[in-house]
Amino acid sequence: MRRVLLATLMAALPAAAMAADAEHVVEARKGYFSLVALEFGPLAAMAKGEMPYDAAAAKAHASDLVTLTKYDPSDLYAPGTSADDVKGTAAKAAIWQDADGFQAKGMAFFEAVAALEPAAGAGQKELAAAVGKVGGTCKSCHDDFRVKR
């Protein structure tokens, strides 16, 4: 009986480790996007007139976003980390089923953020236009690859 129990436990260890790894990947992914939101939020608020436009602050937030886009997020999208696999994530399995489409959405985001940086310090009107483009890339990706909550 002990051997059966031991064999069962030994067989379960890799599955438990994989589950823990998947949960860590999801937490890291959430952390990355929390940083994106932290930097993008004030830019969106300035663009909408919800807070006063501040060229220096806008440039700093935009620069930080550019820095975040230089991070290779591939480790944040390990197979087995969709909403079908792990609780607490909104990532659709479509991310892995349509990897090319997902990457194209990511590249559109990176390009929009690159265009945001020079616009951020140019004035509220210029910032608003660039923020709209970045926000559009976010929405486009969420529409296709994020579970609606």
From Swiss-Prot:
GO CC annotation, single: periplasmic space
GO molecular function: electron transfer activity; heme binding; iron ion binding
PTM characteristics: Binds 1 heme c group covalently per subunit.
Residues the entry annotates as binding heme c: 29, 89-90, 138, 141-142
Gene Ontology biological-process entries: electron transport chain
InterPro entries, per database record: Cyt_c/b562, Cyt_c_II, Cyt_c_prime, Cyt_c_prime_subgr
Taxonomy, superkingdom: Bacteria
Leader peptide range in chain numbering: 1-19
Record's keyword terms, sorted: Electron transport, Heme, Iron, Metal-binding, Signal, Transport
Quaternary structure note: Monomer and homodimer.
Protein purpose: Cytochrome c' is the most widely occurring bacterial c-type cytochrome. Cytochromes c' are high-spin proteins and the heme has no sixth ligand. Their exact function is not known.
Protein name: Cytochrome c'
Source lineage: Bacteria, Pseudomonadati, Pseudomonadota, Alphaproteobacteria, Rhodobacterales
Originating gene: cycP
